[in-house]
Swiss-Prot record:
It comes from Shewanella sp. (strain MR-4). GO terms for cellular component: cytoplasm. It is found in: Cytoplasm. PANTHER family: AROM/DEHYDROQUINATE SYNTHASE, PENTAFUNCTIONAL AROM POLYPEPTIDE. Belongs to the EPSP synthase family. This is 3-phosphoshikimate 1-carboxyvinyltransferase. Disulfide bonds: none annotated. Monomer.
Length: 426
């Protein structure tokens, strides 16, 4: 197993241009596929999740050209649903942002499709989405365990009408349903059951759908009306803004050991909810400065917070390791959906924080972290989870440093993360 040793860092300073957002990249690729016209996507994220989406689209007959560095994609839209004359099996790795939307999109046209992935994907729920699609007439069969991939789709198009979908587990289910609803045979009325988690991710979806010319009537996130007879039309160019979750590590670095760290590609004009991570750092005592497309974090003594972080679950993970450098006990609440991500992130985070000496209480949907007087070095297991690896890079700011096991798992969203992180050292 590969290991990466991070030696203690005294101070950080610098500027990082954040790679494209994973959430926006895969949504935009799918909408461009369903749209009429050719779309040029710039600042596309070059990572495993995006490669799985691109490989699947190519297999389904979608034509596109990628730049040499894979960050510009010119894609010729189908002007409607995806159909296939021969049965297709698509391997989607552990990419939830490809599995969920493609599962929905492939019900719109004609053909037989099988969706598979890595072993962890077979543990990540998809039942709430499948139940909703079945209400609209989709024919989907589970090939192993009820409610989980792999699954088979026999596509004949989607009817419209009323549909209920659970909102309390993952916003990706609602995102997938919203993106396909305009191409159903009749108008679609989506009723959301329970509290909607990760609401800002729905805002990303709605903003992109509007960019591609589709109207959605949002009744306070409890009900969505999507009128029939709409078509996605390419806006020509789509700029993928920087990944706000990825920005969180560099902003935390600035808050803990700045100096001054500036991230570009996200800012006050961002459509991603995870930029609110900077507000949490400010509550902890960091000096934060906002621009339209940048955020600056400057170091200051940090104090603990007790916050509901349901709407920024990915960036909230960074608070868990930043808490090691804050005075007092930090509590992160309402984060049950950490448990259904790339790994059970609540259990994994609690285990690894204890290794470095923190006192940790792990609840059903919360985590409480009290830092020790002196942090210990440790070998951090990353559970094939990119965010675990990046979060624990913060331990470089302890006097003992840290060893990261399997650091290459960051390839899911940020292949050169550790090189960029190293560039901040003074």
């Amino acid at each position: 197993m590969k290991q990466l040793r991070l030696e203690p860092v005294v101070q950080v300073r610098g500027e990082i241009n954040i790679p494209g957002s994973k959430s926006i990249s895969n949504r935009a690729l799918l909408l461009a596929t369903l749209a009429k016209g050719t779309t040029t996507l710039t600042n596309l994220l070059d990572s495993d999740d995006i490669r799985h989406m691109l490989a699947s689209l190519k297999q389904l007959g979608v034509e596109y050209r990628l730049s040499q560095n894979n960050t510009v994609c010119e894609l010729i839209g189908l002007g409607g649903a995806i159909s296939a004359d021969t049965a297709q099996t698509l391997f989607l790795g552990n990419a939830g942002t490809a599995m969920r939307p493609l599962c929905a999109a492939l019900t719109l046209g004609r053909g037989e499709f099988t969706l598979t992935g890595e072993p962890r994907m077979e543990e990540r729920p998809i039942g709430d989405l499948v139940d909703a699609l079945k209400q609209l007439g989709a024919n989907i069969v589970y090939l192993k365990n009820e409610g989980f991939p792999p699954l088979a789709i026999n596509a004949t198009g989607l009817n419209g009408g009323d549909v209920e979908i659970a909102g309390d587990l993952s916003s990706q289910f609602l995102t997938a349903l919203l993106m396909v609803a305009p191409l159903a045979k009749d108008s679609v009325n989506i009723h959301v059951k329970g509290e909607l988690v990760s609401k800002p991710y729905i805002d990303i979806t709605l903003a992109l759908m509007a960019q591609f010319g589709v109207q959605v009537i949002n009744h306070d996130y409890a009900r969505f009306e999507i009128p029939a007879g709409q078509q996605y039309v390419s806006p020509g160019k789509v700029l993928v803004e920087g990944d706000a979750s990825s920005a969180s590590y560099f902003l935390a670095a600035g808050a803990i050991k700045g100096g001054e760290v500036k991230v570009t590609g996200v800012g006050r004009l961002s459509i991603q909810g995870d930029v609110k991570f900077a507000d949490v750092l400010e509550k902890m005592g960091a000096d934060i400065e906002w621009g339209d497309d940048y955020i600056i974090a400057r170091g200051a003594p940090l104090t603990a917070v007790d916050l509901d972080m349901n709407h920024i679950p990915d960036a909230a993970m960074t608070i868990a390791t930043a808490a090691l450098f804050a005075k007092g006990t930090t509590t992160i609440r309402n984060i049950y959906n950490w448990r259904i991500k790339e790994t059970d992130r609540l259990a994994a985070m609690a285990t690894e924080l204890r290794k470095v000496g923190a006192l940790v209480e792990e609840g059903h949907d919360y985590i409480q972290i009290t830092p020790p007087a002196v942090l210990n070095t440790a070998e951090i297991d990353t559970y094939n989870d990119h965010r675990m690896a990046m979060c624990f890079s913060m331990m470089a700011f302890a006097n003992c440093g840290i060893t990261i096991n399997d650091p290459d798992c960051t390839s899911k969203t940020f292949p050169d993360y550790f090189a960029q992180f190293a560039s901040l050292k003074v």
